[in-house]
C-alpha cells in the first residue's frame, strides 16, 4: 500500500470501481492493449487516448461526444469515494432459449467487463446524494432486456424509498430482440415505476446520449422532469437504417 493510500484509504468496492472506470477509459488494460490513438468519428481528428480522457471524450475540434463506458461515466459524474453499486448481481436470462444468445452474452461480457447493459449506483454529485443509472452501448447496443428493466425499476424504487433525485443516462438501440415480448414489457414496467416516483414528488433528470432509440426512447428516456441531451445525439424511435429499409428511400434521396 502506498503512502497516499494509507492517508486516504478506499474500500474494496471503490478500488474495484476505479479499476473498471480506468478500463472503460482505456487507461488500464489487464487483458488487452487499447489503440494509442483515438479518432473522432465526426471530424476525423486523431489524438492519444490520454488527450481524450482529459476532455472526457469530447472532441476538442468539433465538440462531438464519443461513447464512453458506464463505469467511466459514473466516475466523471460522482464525487470521488461516494460510489456504491446497486443490484450488481442482476444478469440476463435466456427465457426464450434464443439461438446463440448465451454465447453472445458471454462474448459481450468478456469484451466489456459488464454483466448487463445497465449499471445503477448511489453516490454524491457536488455533495448531494442521488441515484444514477447508466446504459452502456457497448453491451448489446444498450438494448433493454428483462435484466435492464429490472435494474432500472429497482433504481427508481430505491430513489423513491430514500427520497433521492434520480438521474438516468440513456444510450440504447431499443428493446432486445432475443427476449421478445419480455423485453417489450419493460417499457410499461419502467414507465409505471416512474409514474409512482413522480407521484411521490421525486425529481427525475433524463440525459440522452448517442444513440437513444427504440423502446428506451418510448419509455423512461422521455419521461424526465428535466431532459438533457448530448449535442448531435441520435434520438428517436427508429434509427436511419430502419427508416430507410421501411420506406425504401436512401438518406441521399431525402436531402
Question: Could you say what each language-model-derived stretch is?
Answer:
Residues 46-47, 65-66:
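Cys/His-rich microdomains that often coordinate metals
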Residues 119-198, 205:
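Cleft-lining beta-strand/loop regions that shape enzyme active-site pockets
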Amino acid at each position: 500500500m502506498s503512502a497516499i493510500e494509507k492517508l486516504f484509504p478506499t474500500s474494496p468496492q471503490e478500488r474495484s470501481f476505479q479499476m473498471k472506470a480506468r478500463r472503460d477509459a482505456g487507461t488500464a488494460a489487464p487483458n488487452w492493449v487499447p489503440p494509442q490513438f483515438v479518432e473522432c468519428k465526426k471530424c476525423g481528428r486523431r489524438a492519444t487516448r490520454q488527450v481524450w480522457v482529459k476532455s472526457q471524450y469530447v472532441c476538442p475540434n468539433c465538440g462531438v461526444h464519443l461513447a464512453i463506458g458506464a463505469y467511466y461515466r459514473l466516475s466523471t459524474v460522482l464525487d470521488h469515494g461516494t460510489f456504491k453499486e446497486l443490484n450488481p448481481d442482476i444478469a440476463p436470462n435466456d427465457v426464450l432459449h434464443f439461438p446463440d444468445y448465451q454465447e453472445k452474452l458471454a462474448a459481450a461480457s468478456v469484451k466489456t467487463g459488464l454483466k448487463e447493459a445497465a449499471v445503477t449506483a448511489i453516490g454524491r454529485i457536488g455533495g448531494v446524494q442521488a441515484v444514477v443509472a447508466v446504459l452502456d452501448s457497448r453491451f448489446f447496443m444498450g438494448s433493454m432486456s428483462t435484466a435492464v428493466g429490472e435494474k432500472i425499476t429497482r433504481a427508481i424504487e430505491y430513489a423513491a424509498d430514500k427520497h433521492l433525485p434520480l438521474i438516468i443516462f440513456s444510450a440504447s438501440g431499443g428493446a432486445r430482440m432475443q427476449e421478445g415480448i419480455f423485453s417489450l414489457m419493460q417499457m410499461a414496467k419502467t414507465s409505471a415505476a416512474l409514474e409512482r416516483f413522480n407521484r411521490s414528488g421525486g425529481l427525475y433528470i433524463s440525459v440522452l446520449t448517442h444513440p437513444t432509440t427504440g423502446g428506451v426512447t418510448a419509455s423512461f428516456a422521455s419521461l424526465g422532469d428535466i431532459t438533457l441531451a448530448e449535442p448531435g445525439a441520435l434520438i428517436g424511435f427508429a434509427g436511419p437504417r430502419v427508416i430507410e429499409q421501411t420506406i425504401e428511400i436512401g438518406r441521399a434521396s431525402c436531402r
